[in-house]
Amino acid sequence: YNIEKTLLCAQPNKLCLDAVQKYPDRIIGLVYPNPHDGQKAVDMIYDYVQNKGFRGIKANPLKDAYVADDALMDPIMEAAKDLNIPVFMHCGHPPYSLPWSIALLAERHPDVKLVMIHMGHGHGVYIDATLKMAKRYPNLYLEMSGMPMPSKIREAYEEVGADRIMFGTDAPFHPAVVEAMKVMTSGLNEKQLADVFYNNCAKLMGFDKK
């Protein structure tokens, strides 16, 4: 399905930068700020995007101990809007990264494309909530690593939007073959599989225009 690149993030960001510089044609870097760092985090985003070639932002409320819609995230989102890059946010662990909190952040920043990574993770209530929130807010996108229900991938494709659900692995935490098999057994046809596996992410990140 034409998978030829991967999105990568790491803390410290220098680890990701080393990988991007070593494999520039295969790795797309996501800068990984801690919103608690305030202006320092914003400055780092601009540096990594404008000077080091990174093309998105990773946010993890669970790891960095803030609620997804906390005002701490507003400067990060404003930077994303200014730079025209998407934000990828960990989704599915209370109390930090619940779908409705992420939706409130998306509502405040309608011009920023915000990807709910893990699509609610392993909790059925959170998975259904990601779908509901994504239907409500067109700037919300879904990534399905760690989400155990293949049927929800097809539901997202058909009900949220054909271009707003994408494959991911969350490597090294989940086996890539398991994540791929979830998509393969979701009931999507070949064109739809190509969208989920590659085309949608390529469009979101802008490397479909090469």
Model-derived segments and spans:
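Active-site beta-loop-alpha junctions enriched in small/polar residues
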Residues: 11, 32-36, 60-64, 90-94, ...
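Active-site gating loops and adjacent loop-to-helix segments of metal-dependent hydrolytic enzymes
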Residues: 24, 110-112, 197
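Mid-to-C-terminal alpha-helical segments outside catalytic/metal-binding sites
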Residues: 1-4, 162-164, 177-210
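Catalytic pocket-lining loop regions of alpha/beta-barrel enzymes
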Residues: 55, 69-166
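Alpha-helical elements of Rossmann-like donor-binding domains used by nucleotide-donor carbohydrate transfer enzymes
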Residues: 15-18, 44-47, 75, 101-104, ...
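Conserved active-site loop/cleft motifs that coordinate metal ions or position small ligands
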Residues: 9, 143, 164-169, 174, ...
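Short, charged, surface-exposed secondary-structure boundary motifs
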Residues: 39-42, 66-68, 124-127, 152-153, ...
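Active-site gating/metal-coordination segments in enzymes
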Residues: 4-5, 12-88, 136, 140
